[in-house]
Amino acid sequence: MKLSLVVAVLCLVLLPAASFGQGEPGWNKHSLGANFELSIPMGDFADFLAGTGYGGNVRYQFGADSRGVFTATAGYLSWSKKDLGAGTSVQPAAFNIFLGGKYYVTDGFYASLEGGLYFVNYTYEGVVVGAEGNTTRFMLPIGVGFQKSGFEIGARYMLLDVDFNSFSFTLGYNFAL
């Protein structure tokens, strides 16, 4: 009795997972994925504005051919507070929207290029006064990664303006549609 219950539960879990998973590239194939993202700021962005960031993305992929994929990505990142001294700190956060593509060089390995907008919100906290500001910036993420059986891992260099760049590392899963 217990063994048949275990087998039934495994079938109920594994069979749908196998059919929904494996969002792989290919002609006219669609997938929807979710990624966790870790962002490490570089240059002036790290020196004056942000600590380590974290967030997530949702990505739609449409297969243009056996190696090329069009992508549409939306996500949110929040960086840790940066102490500016004299009792002041700043904490940026951003909502992003990107359009671009991936090219699968070999089975599973890809290079990606996207472009889009970062809607950035800065929160300043001081001893006497606090302030909040918003700005919109153009972003150009250039990356590499590996995708197999729906699972995806990647690294991107995020070009934001001239001095506000970061490395981002992603880990996620893609569901075939």
Task: Provide a role label for each language-model segment.
Residues 75-92, 112-122, 154:
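Outer-membrane beta-barrel translocator/channel fold
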Residues 1-5, 22:
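Positively charged n-region of N-terminal signal peptides that target proteins for export
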Residues 7-16:
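Bacterial N-terminal signal peptides
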Residues 34-38, 56-62, 76, 97-103, ...:
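Residues on the lipid-exposed face of transmembrane beta-strands in outer-membrane beta-barrel proteins
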Residues 20-71, 77, 158, 167-168, ...:
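Short glycine/proline- and aromatic-enriched beta-strand/turn motifs that initiate or cap beta-hairpins
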Residues 44-51, 82-90, 122-131, 163-170:
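Outer-membrane beta-barrel translocator domains and adjoining extracellular loop/strand segments
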Residues 66-70, 108-111, 148-154, 177:
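Repeated loop/turn-to-beta-strand initiation elements of outer-membrane beta-barrel proteins
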Residues 28-32, 48-56, 91-95, 134-140, ...:
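Residues that define the transmembrane beta-barrel architecture of outer-membrane proteins
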